Amino acid sequence: MRGEIISVGTELLLGQILNTNAKYLSEKLALLGIDIYFHTNVGDNEERLKECLNIAFNRSDLIITTGGLGPTVDDITKETVASFLGLPLVENLEAKEEIIRFFEKIGQTPTMNNFKQAFFPEGAKILPNKNGTAPGCIIEKDNKIIIILPGPPSELIPMFEEYVYHYLKSKTNETIKSRVIKIFGLGESKVEEMVRPLLFNSNPTVAPLVGDGYVILRITAKGHDDKEISEMIEDMESRIRGIIGDYIYAVDEEEMEEVVVKLLQKNKLTLAVSESCTGGLLAKKITDVSGASKVFNLGVVSYSNEAKENILGVRKSTLESYGAVSYETAKEMAENVRKLANADFGLSTTGIAGPTGGTPEKPVGLVYVGFATNEEVYVKKLMLSGDRSKIRTRTVLHALDIVRRYLLGIKID
């Protein structure tokens, strides 16, 4: 089934509201095996909305509209769809009573314009709105399906999940499932080169995407049987792992910090961190993970040289000879925070995140990450690109990946 989404609302075109509905609907429809080929945003204008509907009718089997169902004069979606289809608007008494009950619950009397929300194109299947006053509806005409949904996500999502999902599932006999493989330490072009033969596979498909400092390979399989689909995905994941190897750090929703915390918990080991350029972001990422208190002993943000010297015990001679952004300082920061916290591991970050502070010898993007155990210290020098936020985020990923690799017995690049 070919589908498209028409999002109605001038506020979307002005950039006043982020269109999260289209993202949500596309994800849900993909799970039903419905291919979404087009997203259209259109303002609250009858003629332009009719143009969009005319185009959609000529290329799609399923058209979903969002927004424009409220009580005001610029809420024109149902009226425009009805006119486009040549259908009269008829009042639904049950929907009208629901509107009255909604206002009674909040101790108010509905104004007359609210009752326009109880009118629908003739023959439409009504979709109750348990979270607002604007019901949706489904219209089947000329072998096409039009589904009209409210704009607020707090109303659209429950309506879709309770009514629309099951309706569409009965209309389709295919299911789509996806799995996301997360890769760190290789660029997108390198990953694409390594898996290029797999990118031409038709079912399942493999698509490379760029995350925030990492690369994603999305496996998508389509079929009629859940077991068959799962087996296709498992087989493709196995092939990808055979090519990419230890650069794969997580699958689906799992993040790098979750992987590291789980490994620390499994091995009953503890970690302490000392941060300069990342400003506490490393500690935040770790402590965002439930159960991190069992493995995370201490976090120190030592932004100034005085803090590095007085709190962490970095030698004054080190700072004077090599500077705060140096191999030697990162090494001492990692060693000393481990001892200070009585932890198994110490992890440190020091660098120049920019946009100012760089020099020809030490440019913006220069970062050192230190990792100390009770037997050895490893320091990784990085040259990162991007703005301040990206440099900090990527530094954190590199730091966590060092811990991941050490705990898994993988060579630290």
Curated annotation (Swiss-Prot):
CDD domains tied to this protein: cinA (cd00885)
SUPFAM superfamilies with a match to the protein in the record: CinA-like, Molybdenum cofactor biosynthesis proteins
InterPro entries associated with the record: CinA, CinA-like_C, CinA_C, CinA_KH, Competence-induced_CinA, MoaB/Mog-like_dom_sf, MoaB/Mog_dom
Source organism superkingdom: Bacteria
Database matches in Pfam families: CinA, CinA_KH, MoCF_biosynth
Family, similarity comment: Belongs to the CinA family.
Name of the protein described by the UniProt record: Putative competence-damage inducible protein
